Amino acid sequence: VKTFLLTLAIVTIASILSAQNPNGFPVHAVVNSGVLEGDYDNKTGIQTYLGIPYAQPPVGDLRWRGPQAVNQWSGTRMAKTFGPRAIQKHMWDDMLFRSAGLSEDCLYLNVWTPAKAKDKNLPVLLYFYGGGHVAGDGSEYRYDGESMAKEGIVVITVNYRLNLFGYFAHPELSKESPYKASGNYGALDQSAGLQWVKDNIAAFGGDPNQITIAGESAGSMSTSLHMASPLSRDNIAGAIGESGALINPTGPPVPLAEAEQIGVEFVKKTGYTYEEFRELSTAELFELYNKHNTYFPIVLDGYLLPKSLPEIFEAKEQAQVPLLLGWNSAEMGAGAMGKRPFTRAKFEAVVRQRMKADADEALKLYAGAEGQELEQTISDFASDNWLVYSTWKWFDLHREHSDQPVYRYLYSKLRPANDKGERPPAIGAPHACEIEYALGNLHLVSGWQWTEDDRQVSATMKGYFANFIKTGNPNGNDLPAWPTVEAKDDTPPVMVIDVESKAVDAKNDARYRFLDGIYHSNK
């Protein structure tokens, strides 16, 4: 027995030591719910506090309820490892996690701060991960906050509920709710995380009145939502959107009755009564979610979202703050149309099927005939109808209905060769590839043969983002000048971010105005 206990003690000590930062020593922060112990890295000068609870675990009676204020804890809570990530399928290979497994108990956030003892009122970045509201986690290497913290910014990533666990709506849940609606739990988690940052970030040297929210894909859609939401909009000082807005056709919020009906039909498919369904285990629910493959949309719940985003922006009710946004030059590849060879005739058939009476006008705007030009045209059409138009509409709404500066980019840097020496198609920058550039994390993301060009582009994009987070203006530090846009300009300035970044007049806005005539009538 003694031998066993000694072995167990050695293994335990070894595991603790392996989890510790070899260059670190303990640091402490006092937040509203208690004392946290994090790590100070003496090589970087950055403090990290990982796995901080910002709400009670949404389990048991708190499943499918809005986030509840975190309980006080006694003593010192260790904040040195990432908390569990939300329950989710394995979706995309570029999601590389450092979190401690998966759990419904997932409402944790992470803080990287450069603050020294005398520092206070540092600018703050709160970053929402992407993943279609069905996957993702704040521990992913590409979202790491250390590089941006070295720029004098307090960085936070926040976990939120996903898929069935985060967006399930049902009439019975709505009856129980104090605001008589259901769904949107993941977005409510984000809003609660933002409120936690507002209330506690001073403990990490951050300025609660200088919080910029940002995100990519579903994180960008979430950023647009919180600019509009009455629960969130007063807590932010700026917003950055990378590829996506919660505007038709990119996952626009649906009426509560429609979301509730999706929930009713899902429960019916499972063969359980509603009462039985509520009591199922995490594993049982996850199995049913995988089996039935239902998407649970954002909801117009009258609480987090009283109206659609266009309606809120047109009424000038959104956060009146500086906005920096953009998208990538090939968000969706030509493969969206099927297998090679691509032909103009095949493309025209797809356009006519999709655009119906508007097909002739669409084909004039998407005019590539053959070869690489045709591939770019196919990519443009697929990308625009996926999330480029919605991001442009967000841009257009804010410049029209705010006196705050708006900055727009087009990220165009091609991927380098991968570790096998294979080069991707040379038609543009694909979806999500800019994240590690913008946040300065190339060195943490494996699988690519990064070059000096990549590092240069990363320094430029990170520099623009850091300047914007600090001042509401991306310009400075000898970066190429980035003009703000005017409300009525049909060819507004766009910062093309590439090996040689430069501002150019927008060339493709006629496409977005065309799509606006189709999509804006259905908000």
Language-model regions, residue ranges each:
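Serine-hydrolase-like catalytic core of hydrolytic proteins
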Residues: 91-274, 303-306, 312-337
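Short, solvent-exposed turn/loop segments enriched in Gly/Ser/Thr/Pro and often Arg
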Residues: 161-164, 214-218, 410-417, 480-487
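Surface-exposed helix-capping loop/turn segments at secondary-structure junctions
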Residues: 113-122, 201-210, 270-275, 396-407, ...
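Substrate-gating cap/lid region and adjacent catalytic-acid/histidine neighborhood
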Residues: 238, 246-247, 276-452, 464, ...
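Non-catalytic accessory segments of hydrolases
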Residues: 20-184, 208, 448-461, 469-479, ...
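Extracellular structured ligand-interaction cores
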Residues: 35, 104-108, 123, 152-153, ...
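Mature extracytoplasmic/periplasmic domains
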Residues: 422, 475-504
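Bacterial Sec-dependent N-terminal signal peptides
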Residues: 1-23
